[in-house]
Amino acid sequence: MGYLSKLVTSVVFAIPLASAHLAAYTPGMYCPENSYKGTLTNATDPNLVVFDPLYNLPGDSWFLSKGRNCLLAEPTGVWEIAANTIISVPWANWQNSTGYYADGKEYNERPIPYSVTNPEVIAEGLVSESKGLASPNLHAANKSTAAGTAIAISYESNIWAVTMDTLVVISTAPQTPFERLANYSIPDLAPCKECICVTGWVPDGFGQQNMYMAAHKCKITNPTGGKIPKTPSSVPGPGVKGAKQMIAAFQSEGNNVEWNGGEVVPTYSTRMGYLVGAQTDIFD
């Protein structure tokens, strides 16, 4: 495929914005108000908002959006996830979002189909300079080019103890984010009163090549028992089986996947070994 997977040892807005990017919003989200509101001024990421992209950052800055001090902006609740179900998660720019699309617009408030090839979309100025849809900023030309998003879990209650090795991707949702709500099939996970979940997205073109990562305090329920995913998780890549890490790419250090311009983009899809939907191989 042209890209090489390898470990690198070095390791506030109240309303939606048309130009904004996207994050997954849950009751357990760190930076629930979109950014850290404390008095510290030691941020190492020039982008301070949780839905902004992560790009060209050192490992301790991009991982879990630490460089934005999001780990100091505690969640206001807990994200409860039931194993062996399908859950819906909003991708948006603000908490308690509404609408069919992530910018708050309903289905009938956008041209149908919502695609850059639709003359109505072009006429309304909804095509970005990077040839993708401009609002919301989906890094996609239409639903079929939406790269896919993922949920990962670490069976750690202390977020400061979470590492890439303890995180395991548990579900992917192809052709997301596009609509505001993305649906994820959850595998047979063991119960967990307090774990750390992480949502991620790697766009496939239509703008700067970057990634997104947001942390959440989560709780897993499963009346039938379930299992804990195998760790340490493996670096994702073509044909990789079993429990896999999240994708870390396009950063100055700490990448687990190296990418050069013109190569196939590593996304949360089968091209990096992920299954579609529930990652049922994570217990093998």
From Swiss-Prot:
EC annotation from Swiss-Prot or TrEMBL: 1.14.99.-
Main localization of the protein described in the UniProt heading: secreted
Cofactor note: Binds 1 copper ion per subunit.
Pfam families per the UniProt record, alphabetical: LPMO_AA14
Signal peptide interval: 1-20
Top-level EC class as recorded in UniProt: oxidoreductase
Subcellular location: Secreted
Carbohydrate-modified residues: N42, N96, N142, N183
Keyword line: Copper, Disulfide bond, Glycoprotein, Metal-binding, Monooxygenase, Oxidoreductase, Secreted, Signal
Superkingdom: Eukaryota
One of the record's GO cellular component terms: extracellular region
InterPro entries given in the database record: LPMO_AA14 (IPR054497)
UniProt GO MF annotations: metal ion binding; monooxygenase activity
Cofactor(s) in the UniProt record: Cu(2+)
Family statement drawn from the similarity comment of this UniProt entry: Belongs to the polysaccharide monooxygenase AA14 family.
Function text: Lytic polysaccharide monooxygenase (LPMO) that plays decomposes some specific network structures formed between cellulose and hemicellulose in the plant cell walls. Catalysis by LPMOs requires the reduction of the active-site copper from Cu(II) to Cu(I) by a reducing agent and H(2)O(2) or O(2) as a cosubstrate.
Protein name: AA14 family lytic polysaccharide monooxygenase B
Organism whose genome encodes this protein: Talaromyces rugulosus
Recorded name of the encoding gene: AA14B
